[in-house]
């Protein structure tokens, strides 16, 4: 199993709008239907109104690498910069 933790620092007042847009454009639903996707969920920080956590869980790193090349991920990248100031990525494999 392969997991990714993404910590987004959103522009002020943009955190909820980003998640709403991801959902409204059907991106989260499309990701969850991808081959090998076990989990794709966003979480809000209680301490920092600009912080957003994304947890992705995949059957393998190969599945996740195919995922990032999907058209809906290009769509997400096209508007991400309007909402997200910085991104920190952590990853690990469970064997």
Model-predicted regions and their roles:
Residues 7, 11, 20-24, 46, ...:
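N-terminal/domain-start segments enriched in small and hydrophobic, helix-friendly residues
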Residues 22, 67-68, 77-80:
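Short, flexible helix/strand-to-coil boundary loops that buttress conserved ligand/catalytic motifs
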């Amino acid at each position: 199993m392969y997991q990714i933790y993404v910590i987004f620092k959103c522009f002020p007042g943009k955190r909820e709008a980003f998640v709403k847009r991801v959902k409204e454009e059907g991106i989260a639903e499309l990701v969850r239907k991808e081959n090998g996707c076990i989990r794709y969920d966003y979480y809000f920080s209680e301490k920092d109104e600009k912080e957003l956590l994304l947890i992705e869980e995949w059957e393998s790193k190969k599945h996740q690498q195919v995922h990032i090349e999907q058209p809906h991920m290009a769509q997400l990248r096209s508007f991400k910069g309007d909402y997200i100031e910085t991104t920190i990525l952590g990853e690990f494999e469970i064997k």
